[in-house]
């Protein structure tokens, strides 16, 4: 059995462990009594520990909050169902797989939609408990699964969707897959519950299981990993626990990776012990040591991360508690080798290349803008059907991007016309979409997310429409501002790496953050607190007017807000995120 390293000198070790640690210890390697709950017809949900345990299997219990009060008045439990998030490292999926997933979404999910996420995968919303094993068995048949896409594990591994640098992308994508596989849990609990559908009867069977990397109690908190290919930072690498920045050898081949750690975007309103932070540089490793580096960072976080207070359990807090130099030294000790110095790299933007792009291998790639990633047939558009019809004729693959868009990848010259015709006829290509809208993002929020405090996905289209009018008023329609709305401070919409970030505070009210940058390397500062969308638009009307009149050539809105002193930059988030007066420049490496 795995023996986790005993650590000393960490304040949290003197405090009681969180109940989640008990839950994991007693879960029989994540099986719990989920199978018993699946047989219970009296509720649409899961009871006790199982409510949490299903998250390790890639699901969350949710309900339709739009009708929650109505059902309560009728003495009914909430309309419970599950969200499922697939594991799809790098976001690549085959058209043949998509056709089967589309069929399941239409026939078995409450909302009859597929949601593309900013972690390069898809989600089903509204899957009833009775259909869960059917769903997982379908994924298994297609060579897919949902293990470790939620809870205290390494989540879906991102990889830059770069259709131009085809060979470098192929190499980086292969490492994204290898990292994902290497950091997966080893328990058979997922297969026992969802595919085989049987209990393991003997405790001796559990004694044969081991988690050599994650340990019996897995990680202290969620853990996010990305592989990024400069100069495009589409995966928002500074917002992850662990990042591998692919470095080219100058001839289009992979020379190795710069390794960064400690990014994360969640916080809690009013809790100054929580804060978003950008990831910090550890060093460079050649490709053959990438898995060793990944394992060393993960096991360091496993053993040193806070298991008492989950609000301070992410890797960024571990680095803050240990100090960056000590964290790096521990990782190097576990790697059995030192990092090499960081290799130079630079990001120039984050947005997807909407439309056709030709790769260096001669194949074409069509990036479709999907607002908030929602594929559904409604409102005069048949987006879900459109992708299905493309999947029926496409011989290449699909790539889900970290900007919630979809790439129809590897299209030969002769196949372009038919695919574009289908995309246009089903509303997947629509001329006149502003750059502002193309660079906007939202989380799901209402009606399904139980943590939502304010709307996000459902208000984004109209909010961007009003912001487009303001941009036109000030003569900036040909430009863009990275704008993101998230329904609560947990960070799913990545608003804490936006130039304009709205964070839900209460129904109809948001905190307005400004001052991030286009490249995604700076956290925006709180500008106005607990205000309505009309009030936010009024504030932005004034600020965008100033930006239009006084900006330097090529200067983004966020950079302008910092240069002119509208807000102070967040330079050292643990110190100055909540108190701008403490903003003092520090060395990041």
UniProtKB/Swiss-Prot annotation:
Gene3D superfamilies: Sulfite Reductase Hemoprotein, domain 1. Siroheme binds at residue 492. It catalyses: hydrogen sulfide + 3 NADP(+) + 3 H2O = sulfite + 3 NADPH + 4 H(+). InterPro entries: CysI, NiRdtase/SiRdtase_haem-b_fer, Nit/Sulf_reduc_fer-like_dom_sf, NO2/SO3_Rdtase_4Fe4S_dom, NO2/SO3_Rdtase_4Fe4S_prot, NO2/SO3_Rdtase_4Fe4S_sf, NO2/SO3_Rdtase_FeS/sirohaem_BS. Its EC number is 1.8.1.2. Keywords: 4Fe-4S, Amino-acid biosynthesis, Cysteine biosynthesis, Heme, Iron, Iron-sulfur, Metal-binding, NADP, Oxidoreductase. PROSITE patterns: NIR_SIR. Its cofactor is siroheme; [4Fe-4S] cluster. One of its GO terms (molecular function) is metal ion binding. GO terms for biological process: cysteine biosynthetic process; hydrogen sulfide biosynthetic process; sulfate assimilation. One of its GO terms (cellular component) is sulfite reductase complex (NADPH). Binds 1 siroheme per subunit. Binds 1 [4Fe-4S] cluster per subunit. [4Fe-4S] cluster binds at residues 443, 449, 488, 492. It is an enzyme of class 1 (oxidoreductase). Pathway: Sulfur metabolism; hydrogen sulfide biosynthesis; hydrogen sulfide from sulfite (NADPH route): step 1/1. It holds the Pfam family NIR_SIR_ferr. Belongs to the nitrite and sulfite reductase 4Fe-4S domain family. Alpha(8)-beta(8). The alpha component is a flavoprotein, the beta component is a hemoprotein. Component of the sulfite reductase complex that catalyzes the 6-electron reduction of sulfite to sulfide. This is one of several activities required for the biosynthesis of L-cysteine from sulfate. This is Sulfite reductase [NADPH] hemoprotein beta-component. It comes from Neisseria meningitidis serogroup A / serotype 4A (strain DSM 15465 / Z2491).
């Amino acid at each position: 059995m795995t023996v986790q390293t005993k650590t000393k000198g960490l304040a949290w070790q003197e405090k009681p462990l969180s109940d989640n640690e008990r839950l994991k210890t007693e879960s029989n390697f994540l099986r719990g009594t989920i199978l018993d709950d699946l047989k219970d017809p009296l509720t649409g949900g899961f009871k006790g520990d199982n409510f949490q345990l299903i998250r390790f299997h890639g699901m969350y219990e949710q309900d339709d909050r739009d009708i929650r009060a109505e059902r309560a008045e009728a003495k009914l439990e909430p309309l419970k169902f599950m969200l499922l998030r697939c594991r799809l490292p790098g976001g690549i999926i085959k058209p043949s797989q998509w056709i089967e997933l589309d069929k399941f979404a239409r026939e078995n999910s409450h909302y009859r939609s597929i949601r593309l996420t900013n972690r390069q995968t898809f989600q089903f919303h509204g899957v009833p408990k009775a259909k869960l094993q059917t769903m997982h068995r379908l994924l298994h048949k297609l060579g897919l699964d949902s293990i470790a896409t939620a809870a205290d594990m390494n989540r879906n591994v991102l990889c830059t969707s770069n259709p131009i640098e085809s060979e470098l992308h192929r190499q980086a994508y292969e490492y994204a897959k290898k990292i994902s596989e290497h950091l997966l849990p080893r328990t058979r609990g997922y297969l026992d519950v969802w595919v085989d559908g049987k209990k393991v009867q003997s405790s001796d069977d559990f004694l044969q299981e081991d988690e050599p990397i994650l340990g019996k109690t897995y990680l202290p908190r969620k853990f996010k990993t990305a592989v990024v290919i400069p100069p495009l930072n589409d995966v928002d690498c500074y917002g992850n626990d662990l990042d591998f920045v692919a470095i080219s050898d100058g001839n289009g081949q992979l020379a190795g990776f710069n390794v960064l750690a400690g990014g994360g975007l969640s916080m809690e309103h009013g809790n100054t012990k929580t804060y978003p932070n950008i990831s910090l540089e550890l060093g460079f490793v050649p490709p053959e040591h990438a898995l060793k580096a990944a394992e060393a960072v993960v096991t360091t976080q496993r053993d040193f991360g806070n298991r008492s207070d989950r609000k301070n359990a992410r890797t960024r807090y571990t680095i803050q508690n240990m100090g960056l130099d000590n964290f790096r030294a521990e990782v190097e000790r576990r790697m059995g080798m030192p990092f090499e110095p960081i290799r130079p790299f630079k990001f120039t933007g984050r947005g997807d290349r909407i439309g056709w792009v030709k790769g260096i291998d001669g194949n074409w790639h069509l990036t479709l803008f999907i607002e908030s990633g929602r594929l559904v047939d409604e409102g005069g558009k048949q987006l879900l059907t459109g992708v299905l019809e493309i999947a029926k004729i496409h011989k290449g693959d699909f790539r889900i991007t970290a900007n919630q868009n979809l790439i129809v990848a590897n299209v030969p010259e002769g196949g372009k016309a038919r695919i574009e015709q289908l995309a246009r006829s089903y509303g997947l290509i629509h001329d006149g979409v502003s750059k502002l809208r193309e660079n906007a993002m939202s989380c799901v929020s209402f009606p399904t997310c139980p943590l939502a405090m304010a709307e996000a996905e459902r208000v984004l289209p109209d909010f961007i429409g009003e912001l487009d009018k303001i941009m036109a008023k000030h003569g900036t329609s040909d430009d863009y501002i990275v704008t993101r709305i998230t329904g609560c401070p947990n960070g799913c919409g990545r608003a804490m790496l936006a130039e304009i970030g709205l964070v839900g505070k209460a129904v109809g009210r948001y905190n307005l953050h400004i001052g991030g940058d286009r490249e995604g390397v700076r956290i925006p500062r709180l500008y106005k607190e607990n205000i309505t969308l009309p009030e936010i638009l009024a504030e932005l009307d004034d600020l965008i007017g100033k930006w239009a009149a006084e900006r330097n050539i090529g200067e983004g809105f966020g950079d302008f807000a910092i240069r002119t002193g509208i807000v102070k930059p967040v330079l050292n988030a643990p110190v100055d995120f909540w108190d701008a007066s403490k903003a003092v420049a520090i060395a990041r490496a």
